Amino acid sequence: MKKISILGSTGSIGTQTLDVIREHGDMQVVALSCGRNLSLIEKQAREFKPQFVSVSDENDAKKLRTSLADTDIEVGYGMDGLIRCATIEPCDIVVTAIVGMLGIRPTIAAIKAKKTIALANKETLVTAGHIIIPLAKEYGVSILPVDSEHSAIFQSLQGNSMNPIKKILLTASGGPFRGRKLSELEGIRVEDALKHPNWSMGQKITIDSSTMVNKGLEVIEAKWLFDVDLSQIQVVVHPQSVIHSAVEYADGAVIAQLGTPDMRIPIQYALYYPSRPALSGDRLDLFKLKDLTFEAPDLDTFKGLALAMKAARAGGNIPTAFNAANERAVALFLNKKIKYLEIIDIIEACMENASFIENPSVDEILDTEQCAYDYISKRW
């Protein structure tokens, strides 16, 4: 029986991971972590009976410890708690589903503890791919992608390890504002940006999808995961979200993964790889598909993707400045402190303000993040 630890169990990916585990009943949850959602993590802890749970705040940990006093579950908090979740024994797979650069240190700890990583925290590779990927190779650790697009690429690579990749076709829905021009995005409200046409996701990633910043982050993640040059990654807007991504080989063959927009499918593939057990849910009916369409991204309107590509080409700590600026800008927008288009203004300003470091350490990555936050606090 595989033993699973989930970092970020109360978020969208975390809850769907538990849905998969619940459906099959043949995996054991050994650790859970969350931010501040005490009521949900208590319910999860009572249902799945992990050895250890962790929350972000010490006072919340005291409350949860009291709530779970009738159980044998240990409660921790903060970064120490996250690292304990990531390294707990016995454990086979660590699902990293926390948002942001908070995932870097726990992921490094999990790799050093030789845990298989089911990666849903794209920011870890965006900001620290130059550290994470060599470390995983050094420790012989597999990093299995949970993002639907990267899972699709991973699946399209199976059985083709000896064949050279010509191109990765990274698909994007285009988000709720596909087809609009920049001038039409002036008055976008939070409620508008949270209406994704195809996927059910958390608030932050839904906003990122609307700006296409998310696709930019995924480009950088794909570069590290699949060891390809940026020039080999092509973003393709595919509004139906049926083809989740594809790989073109040197002979011209294109292998793609298709399916319904259900995040449980890539989650399950990461948990059970290389097996494919049955999973409940809607099936893809080709006869009901009216058409599949493809178009190039509009980089003039969706500057977030263009800026991500610029950050990726610059390398060093610039992707960190890009990511940190976006995280803070999205939070400000969700709290109605800035306008929608200011998200991109903030990202661009922070990238220009960052002091370049070619090969940043973890501490330098986190310093770059803090510098971006400080810069935003002063200007916005």
From Swiss-Prot:
Catalyzes the NADPH-dependent rearrangement and reduction of 1-deoxy-D-xylulose-5-phosphate (DXP) to 2-C-methyl-D-erythritol 4-phosphate (MEP). Its EC number is 1.1.1.267. The gene is dxr. Pfam families: DXP_redisom_C (PF08436), DXP_reductoisom (PF02670), DXPR_C (PF13288). It comes from Agathobacter rectalis (strain ATCC 33656 / DSM 3377 / JCM 17463 / KCTC 5835 / VPI 0990) (Eubacterium rectale). This is 1-deoxy-D-xylulose 5-phosphate reductoisomerase. The keyword Metal-binding applies. Its cofactor is Mg(2+); Mn(2+). It catalyses: 2-C-methyl-D-erythritol 4-phosphate + NADP(+) = 1-deoxy-D-xylulose 5-phosphate + NADPH + H(+).
